[in-house]
A protein has these predicted regions:
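N-terminal presequence-like segments and the immediate start of the first folded domain
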Residues: 1-74, 78-94, 100-151
Length: 151
């Protein structure tokens, strides 16, 4: 089935570390709408650098959950808009899974940025947040995968 469903892989975004698209679109059973399944998205830029990861002169890296979350949400919005030819946006997300590497330190900062997009819980998507041991790169402290629906 996945070979026959449209995929979206913007050339300006960072490409996945394995062979998968940024999103895949599936028409709804009634044919009137479509679901966009967005792959796990980080703050990685097209040039391979990361928003919210600053290298320090002593060799350490400062990681900022708010900057990373804002960048992730912006990247997701661009992916959804591209996959839908501008007919949908991040506001059409109906379900999301948030992966954090440090729930204790980063949950409130991630929520602060999340609430910038969805200030009303009645219009926010269903969401699950889980702590994971690691994400693909040490510079990544938040990753979000989601599903959007539009008509």
């Amino acid at each position: 089935m996945s070979q026959s469903t449209p995929y979206f892989r913007p050339s300006t975004h960072a490409q996945g570390l394995a062979n998968y698209p940024h999103a895949r679109t599936v028409r709804s059973p009634d044919g009137k709408g479509a679901y966009i399944y967005v792959s796990g998205t980080s703050s990685r830029r097209g040039d391979g650098t990361f928003v919210g990861a600053t290298s320090n002169s002593n060799g350490t890296t400062t990681l900022d959950i708010r900057q990373q979350t804002a960048a992730v949400l912006s990247n997701i919005d661009e992916i959804i808009q591209g996959a839908s030819n501008g007919r949908a946006s991040i506001r059409d997300v109906v379900d999301a899974t948030v992966f954090l590497t440090n729930m204790k330190d980063d949950y409130s900062g991630m929520n602060a940025e999340w609430n910038q997009i969805w200030s009303d819980r009645n219009t926010a998507p269903a969401r699950t947040t889980v702590e994971v041991r690691a994400l693909p790169r040490d510079e990544i402290i938040v990753e979000i995968k989601c599903t959007a629906y539009y008509v």
